[in-house]
Design a protein with these regions (language model features):
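A short macromolecule-binding patch
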Residues: 94-99, 160-166, 649-665, 713-718
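Intrinsically disordered, low-complexity mixed-charge segments
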Residues: 1-7, 11-14, 23-24, 707-728
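Charge-lined substrate channels and their catalytic hotspots, especially those that engage the 3′ end
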Residues: 1-283, 290-336, 374-375, 671-672, ...
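Electropositive polyanion-binding surfaces
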Residues: 32, 181, 186-188, 212-217, ...
Length: 728
C-alpha cells in the first residue's frame, strides 16, 4: 500500500472509530462490519497497526480497538549535543521538549512514543520517551580510535553524543585517525554503550579529501550514478535534432545571453529583453531537461531520489549526470538548445500585463559572468563595454527593468535579508587560502529579479488553471515568536504592528529598512530571520510570506532541482493537450510525495553545504591560532556567545573563558551580564577576539575576548600563557 492510500485509509478508519455510534470491536469484527473482503484484511491490519503506532488508537485488554485518550504521542526524536532533545509530532504546532533524563535511550532520528509531562502547561510542552518504535540511524561516519584490546568510534555528528564500542575483530583493520563508516549492531541500554562494526574505511583524517568525503557519507549523499543510468545517458545525443525542434517557437534570432558565476557549468537559464514604447518584453528561457529525462526512467527515479544538486565547497554532486547537466541541457553559447520559455510583457510599473509559456528552441549569443556585467553597468569599464558593445543596450534595459520589478516587490512588502554568503577559495590540495563574502551586485540582482517574476508568473497561471502543481510556499511566522521579537525591539524604540495574531510581511520589511545602517542592524536582522519559518514545496498554493506573494513556484532550475523538472512535465502535458483526467489523477497521486521528499532533500543538501563550509573555515582558522580579529556578537546562549568575523567565520567565546567576572545569561535581552562589573556582551556588539583553538572533528572554533586595554601583541602573549597552562 503506497503512502497516499495508507493515509487516506487511516483517516477513514480513524473517523469510523471516533464516531459516537462506534462500539469497540476486534479487527475481525471490524472487517465484517465494514464489508472488507478476506483478500484485503491484511491491508486493514496494516492500517490499524499504523494508527496504533501513531498513538491515535489503542487496543483494550480484550483485544478491541478504541480511540486513544491522548495518553501517548508518536514522533521523530531530534537529539541535541547537550543531551536533551525534541520530538516532532504530526499535527502539533511546536516540537515537544524532552529533558536529558527523560530520553530513555532514544537516539537522533529515532521514532518514539512519548507521554506529556504533568507540568507541561507552560509555553513549551515537555514529555518523556516511553518507547522506541524504530531506530532512525543504522550507519554513522566516525573517527576511529584503537586500543590494545578493542576500538571505539566517535561519531562526527555531535547529535550522537555516545562513542560506539568496536570489537577488534570487527574493525576491518582500521587504525587510530581513520574516518570510518560504522554500522550499529547493538544500540545499548541501561548505561551500556552502543556497539558496532566498521563497514568502510574512508581514509585517514589527515589525507586530502577525506574530510569532505566524511561529510558526503555522513549525509548519505549519492556520489556515483549506476551503470544502468550511465548507459541510458550514453544514448542521449550531444546535439539537438531537427525532430526535437519541430513544432517549437524558434527564437534563435533573438538576442540572448546567460549570466552566471565564472565557475558555473550547468547553465539552465537565459535572458532576452526588448522594449517597445512603454512595454518591456522579458523572455526567461529555461533548459528543457524533461525532453531528456523521461518520466519513471531509471534516470528520473535517481533524480527524484537525489532531489537537488549539492554544491559543496570543493565539488558538485549533481542531480543529473554531467553529460546532461553540463552538456545538452546546459544553455551553452552558440549551440541550439531546447527550452521552456516564459515570455512576459511588463509595463513601466512592473505589472505583467500578458505572458506566454511555450516550448522553444534558442541559441545563446554570449555567455556572460556576473563580474563582466557588473563591470559594464557599475564600473563602466571601457574594455568590457567594447568587448560586449552589441549587448550593452540590453544590459542597460535589464538594469532598468530589474529596478522596476524590485521596487514593485518591495512596495507590496517583500523581505530582503542581505546576509553575506561565504565564498571559500581552495588551493589545488584542497586547503582554504581565503574566505570572503560573495559579491552581491547589480548583475546578481538582475538575474534574481527576473527569475522571481518568471516563477511568480508561472505559479499564478497554473493556480488559476486549477491543475495539479508543485508550489514553493512560505508560511506566516509563529505568532509567539513575532510577539517575542516585538517585545525585544521595543528596547531600541522600534515597533511592529501585529493584527489579529498575524503580521504582514511589510511590517518586517519596514523594520529592516528602519534599522539599516544602525549599530543594532545585525542583531535585529538575525532575530527577525529566526522568527520566520522555512520555505517548502507543497501541492497547495498557500502563498509565500517572505516574497509577499500569493503565488510562487520553482520553475527556473530543472538541471539542479527536481520540483522544477516536475513542473516542466506538467506544463508540457498541458501545452500538448495531454492533461486529461487520467493524467490529472496521476499527478494528484504522486505530487504530495514529490513535494515532501524534495523539501527533505533540500534541507539535507543545505545542511551538508553548511557543514563543509564550517569544516573549511575551521581548517582556515587553524593556521591563525593566536591572531587577533574584530568581529560582531552574532548569538548569545547560556554557555557563551558567538562572534562572527567580517569574512563570515564564526566562533564561540565560552562563558568559562570570561575570567574577569561571573557572567549570567539574560534570555529576554540576548546578553551576558557580569554580576560584579555589570559588563554587558550583547547581540550586535563589536568585540576584539583572539583565536584560541580549533577542532576539525567537531568543526568548532574557540575565541577569547581581547580586553580593550590590552595591546594585540600582549593579548597573544596572554593567550599563549593560558594555552600552555592548559596543556602542561
Amino acid at each position: 500500500m503506497n503512502k497516499e492510500l495508507l493515509q487516506e485509509r487511516k483517516k477513514m478508519i480513524y473517523d469510523f472509530i471516533c464516531d459516537e455510534l462506534y462500539v469497540p470491536m476486534k479487527a475481525k469484527e471490524m472487517a465484517i462490519v465494514l464489508n472488507v473482503p478476506k483478500s484485503q484484511r491484511a491491508e486493514l491490519m496494516e492500517v490499524l497497526d499504523a494508527l496504533t503506532a501513531d498513538g491515535k488508537v489503542e487496543i483494550s485488554g480484550r483485544g478491541k480497538y478504541v480511540k486513544s485518550e491522548g495518553k501517548y504521542l508518536t514522533g521523530v526524536f531530534t537529539a541535541h549535543p547537550r543531551g536533551f532533545g525534541f520530538v516532532t509530532v504530526e499535527g502539533e504546532e511546536e516540537d515537544i521538549f524532552i529533558p536529558a533524563a527523560q530520553t530513555n535511550g532514544a537516539l537522533h532520528k529515532d521514532t518514539v512514543q512519548i507521554t506529556l509531562s504533568k507540568n507541561s502547561s507552560g509555553k513549551r510542552k515537555e514529555g518523556t520517551v516511553t518507547k522506541i518504535l524504530s531506530r532512525g540511524t543504522e550507519q554513522l561516519v566516525c573517527t576511529y580510535e584503537k586500543s590494545k584490546t578493542f576500538g571505539f568510534a566517535v561519531p562526527d555528528n555531535p547529535r550522537f553524543a555516545q562513542d560506539i564500542f568496536i570489537p577488534l575483530e570487527r574493525s576491518k583493520g582500521a587504525v587510530s585517525g581513520h574516518k570510518v563508516v560504522v554500522e550499529i549492531t547493538d544500540y545499548g541500554k541501561n548505561g551500556k554503550k552502543p556497539e558496532g562494526k566498521v563497514v568502510e574505511i574512508i581514509g585517514h583524517i589527515n589525507d586530502p579529501g577525506t574530510d569532505i568525503m566524511s561529510i558526503v557519507k555522513g549525509y548519505d549523499l549519492p556520489v556515483e550514478f549506476s551503470q544502468k543510468i550511465m548507459k541510458q545517458v550514453e544514448n542521449v545525443s550531444n546535439e539537438v535534432s531537427a525532430a526535437d525542434m519541430a513544432g517549437r517557437m524558434d527564437l534563435r534570432d533573438w538576442q540572448t545571453v546567460t549570466i552566471d558565476g565564472e565557475d558555473a557549468k550547468d547553465l539552465d537559464d537565459a535572458i532576452t529583453l526588448t522594449k517597445e514604447g512603454d512595454l518591456y518584453e522579458l523572455g526567461v528561457h529555461i533548459a528543457d531537461v524533461s525532453n531528456y529525462v523521461q518520466e519513471s526512467s531509471a534516470l528520473d527515479v535517481e533524480a527524484l531520489k537525489r532531489g537537488t544538486s549539492v554544491y559543496l565547497v570543493d565539488r558538485v554532486i549533481p542531480m543529473l549526470p554531467h553529460k546532461l547537466s553540463n552538456g545538452i541541457c546546459s544553455l551553452n553559447a552558440g549551440e541550439n538548445r531546447l527550452a521552456l520559455s516564459c515570455i512576459m510583457k511588463i509595463d513601466e510599473k512592473g505589472n505583467v500585463i500578458d505572458h506566454t509559456i511555450a516550448e522553444t528552441v534558442i541559441k545563446v549569443d554570449r555567455r556572460m559572468s556576473y563580474t563582466s556585467v557588473k563591470k559594464i553597468l557599475e564600473e563602466h569599464d571601457v574594455a568590457e563595454i567594447e568587448e560586449y558593445k552589441e549587448l550593452v543596450p540590453m544590459f542597460e534595459r535589464m538594469k532598468e527593468l530589474a529596478a522596476i520589478l524590485r521596487k514593485k516587490r518591495m512596495k507590496r512588502g517583500s523581505i530582503d535579508f542581505d546576509f553575506p554568503e561565504t565564498k571559500i577559495i581552495l588551493n589545488e590540495q584542497g586547503k582554504p587560502v581565503d574566505i570572503k563574502p560573495y559579491d552581491r551586485n547589480v548583475a546578481t540582482k538582475i538575474i534574481e529579479d527576473f527569475m522571481l517574476i518568471a516563477n511568480e508568473t508561472v505559479a499564478q497561471d497554473y493556480f488559476w488553471q486549477e491543475l495539479p502543481f508543485v508550489y514553493r510556499t512560505h508560511d506566516n511566522p509563529d505568532t509567539e515568536k513575532i510577539k517575542k521579537l516585538g517585545t525585544f525591539i521595543n528596547n531600541f524604540g522600534y515597533t511592529i504592528h501585529i493584527g489579529q495574531d498575524e503580521i504582514h510581511p511589510k511590517e518586517l520589511q519596514k523594520l529592516l529598512m528602519k534599522i539599516d545602517g544602525t549599530p543594532e542592524e545585525a542583531l535585529i536582522s538575525r532575530l527577525t530571520l529566526r522568527s520566520m519559518k522555512q520555505a517548502k514545496y507543497t501541492t497547495v498554493s498557500t502563498g509565500h510570506f517572505g516574497l509577499a506573494t500569493n503565488y510562487y513556484c520553482h520553475f527556473t532550475s530543472p538541471i539542479r532541482r527536481y520540483p522544477d523538472l516536475q513542473i516542466h512535465r506538467i506544463i508540457k502535458d498541458n501545452l500538448r493537450g495531454r492533461m486529461n483526467q487520467k493524467r490529472i489523477e496521476h499527478y494528484d497521486s504522486i505530487l504530495p510525495e514529490v513535494a515532501k521528499h524534495s523539501s527533505e532533500m533540500e534541507r539535507r543538501a543545505d545542511e551538508a553545504e553548511r557543514e563543509t563550509d564550517k569544516l573549511k573555515k575551521v581548517e582556515y582558522m587553524e593556521e591563525r591560532i593566536g591572531q587577533v580579529f574584530e568581529g560582531v556578537i552574532s548569538g548569545v546562549q547560556e554557555w557563551g556567545f558567538y562572534v562572527e568575523l567580517p569574512n563570515t567565520v564564526e566562533g564561540l567565546v565560552h562563558v568559562t573563558s570570561l575570567t574577569d567576572d561571573f557572567y549570567h545569561y539574560e534570555e529576554s535581552s540576548y546578553e551576558m551580564i557580569g554580576e560584579r562589573t555589570n559588563k554587558h556582551y550583547k547581540l550586535g556588539q563589536k568585540v576584539k577576539v583572539i583565536v584560541a583553538d580549533t577542532d576539525k572533528i567537531m568543526r568548532t572554533i574557540d575565541f577569547r575576548v581581547v580586553r580593550d586595554d590590552v595591546e594585540p601583541d600582549e593579548a597573544v602573549k596572554d593567550e599563549a600563557s593560558v594555552l600552555s597552562k592548559m596543556t602542561d
